[in-house]
Curated annotation (Swiss-Prot):
GO biological process, one term: methionine biosynthetic process
Protein name in UniProt: Bifunctional protein FolD
Keyword Hydrolase annotated: yes
The entry's keywords: Amino-acid biosynthesis, Histidine biosynthesis, Hydrolase, Methionine biosynthesis, Multifunctional enzyme, NADP, One-carbon metabolism, Oxidoreductase, Purine biosynthesis
HAMAP family in the cross-refs: THF_DHG_CYH
Function per UniProt: Catalyzes the oxidation of 5,10-methylenetetrahydrofolate to 5,10-methenyltetrahydrofolate and then the hydrolysis of 5,10-methenyltetrahydrofolate to 10-formyltetrahydrofolate.
GO MF annotations, alphabetized: methenyltetrahydrofolate cyclohydrolase activity; methylenetetrahydrofolate dehydrogenase (NADP+) activity
Reactions mediated catalytically: (6R)-5,10-methylene-5,6,7,8-tetrahydrofolate + NADP(+) = (6R)-5,10-methenyltetrahydrofolate + NADPH; (6R)-5,10-methenyltetrahydrofolate + H2O = (6R)-10-formyltetrahydrofolate + H(+)
Record EC number: 1.5.1.5, 3.5.4.9
Species this protein is from: Prochlorococcus marinus (strain MIT 9313)
Lineage per the UniProt record: Bacteria, Bacillati, Cyanobacteriota, Cyanophyceae, Synechococcales
Any one GO CC term of the record: cytosol
Amino acid sequence: MALRLDGKQLAAELEQRLQAEIAAGLVQAGRPPGLAVLRIGDDPASGVYVANKQKACGRIGVASHLTHLPETVSVSKVLATIQALNIDERVDGILLQLPLPKGLDEGPLLAAIDPEKDADGLHTLNLGRLLKGEPGPRSCTPAGVMALLARHQISLERKRAVVIGRSILVGQPMALMLQAANATVSVAHSHTGDLASLTQQADVLVVAAGRARMIGAEHVKPGAVVVDVGIHRLPLDPELGTQAKARLCGDVRTQEVEPLASALTPVPGGVGPMTVTMLLVNTVARWQQHCGLPFGLRDLLV
């Protein structure tokens, strides 16, 4: 049976560490870390994600500043809001909640965020820092995956890693982080032919395809570490009526893969909690930098 890489447990441990970092620097800083969340529109899923991030801030002592703009907002208004947050001395990290409503291009808006306040690690400058191995905010989901692997002492040295998905949000930065850990990395995508022949070579398989239950036993090498980044809400069973509960799944068919894998992230409770925690890590690290405090989180921002 595969070892379950419990992101929920590690996230709780890291929250305690972040609390201690904040407590140690609070007197010298004169203020707590601040995270500004910019939400546009009323997408229900985005509302849930924003609420979860605000709760996490509250648990560790980060001040949360929410700005909620209507779906019909102009680009100029969004840019003005971002510029105001860039110069707000209470704010150490800025998060633009994605996805955006139709008609808004995330590229120019992400680029408008001060790279030193980039809580999501998605600014072009910070992606370049990652590419060059320079310090800076890191993309939250890939950084969370790396922390999970490190926590369970899963070595990447000379391992063959395959990342399914090439998004800027997950796939591309994930590949760079694995390379930096001395893995040999291949990136698969929607135009990759004979996917199984590639993934069966992987000692570490990271699946960020965005397709529910895409990966099964036929894709997995025995003994591989399988990281499932996907999360999907399955349709409710109409026969259960009001008793029906929403079910979640990932990109991996867990029941098929678990007997083969040496380690596996569950869905939910694997990568998801770590994504939120790494957002907090980026924010607290920026606070330490902005306030001239000792930087105690270097090992989490590889």
